[in-house]
């Protein structure tokens, strides 16, 4: 459906978002973990999404399915360089919604991207509050909470979301 207001056409996000979603996964020397991540990412993939793996100098080099683009650093440049490479390739591809995943995290349900692209916030993350085992860090506190968002005093994200804006 398209609506025109004062001569300006508007199309609902749900009609266009999937073709402009970009997913980048950073990896380094974890072939088995990356394989699991790829299985889950492709199972719950938004229609038309671009998927990229940034291999940060893995030995042996990472391998990906033919439907996935591979960016490789010949030698490890670190997580920051991998995330920057992820942003660059997704922006260059014209993606509007950018999801940067670590290789040890993945979606577990269809439609996982909808709360992110429907949020008015241009930058969000999925993160864990503390360690799963008996050892606890207890270093994060809740700053803000509403019915859609929680803001913490620190960052421990395994997936970062950015809107192109």
Language-model features: locations:
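Acidic donor-diphosphate engagement hotspot in glycosyltransferases and nucleotidyltransferases
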Residues: 62, 83, 109-113
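A conserved acidic beta->alpha catalytic loop
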Residues: 53-63, 106
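Conserved catalytic core of nucleotide-sugar-dependent glycosyltransferases
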Residues: 108-165
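Short beta-strand-to-loop acidic/aromatic patch adjacent to the donor-nucleotide binding site
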Residues: 95-106
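Short, acidic, metal-binding catalytic loop of nucleotide-sugar glycosyltransferases
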Residues: 39-48
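Short beta-strand/loop segment that forms part of the nucleotide-sugar
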Residues: 48-57, 71-73
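N-proximal low-complexity "stem/linker" segments adjacent to membrane-targeting elements
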Residues: 1-39
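Glycine-rich, basic loop-to-helix element that forms the pyrophosphate-binding segment
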Residues: 74-90
């Amino acid at each position: 459906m398209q609506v025109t207001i004062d001569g300006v056409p508007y199309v609902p996000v749900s009609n266009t978002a999937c073709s402009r979603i970009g997913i980048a996964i950073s990896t380094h020397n974890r072939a088995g973990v990356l394989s699991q991540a790829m299985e889950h990412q492709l199972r719950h993939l938004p229609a038309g999404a671009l998927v990229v793996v940034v291999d940060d100098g893995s030995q042996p080099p990472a391998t990906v399915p033919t439907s996935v683009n591979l960016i490789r650093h010949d030698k490890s440049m670190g997580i920051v360089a991998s995330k920057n490479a992820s942003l660059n390739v997704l922006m260059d591809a014209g993606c509007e919604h950018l999801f940067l995943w670590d290789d040890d995290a993945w979606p577990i349900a269809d439609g996982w991207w909808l709360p992110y692209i429907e949020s008015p916030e241009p930058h969000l993350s999925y993160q864990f509050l503390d360690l799963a085992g008996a050892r606890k860090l207890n270093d994060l506190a809740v700053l803000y909470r509403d019915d859609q968002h929680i803001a913490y005093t620190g960052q421990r994200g395994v997936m970062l979301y950015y809107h192109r804006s």
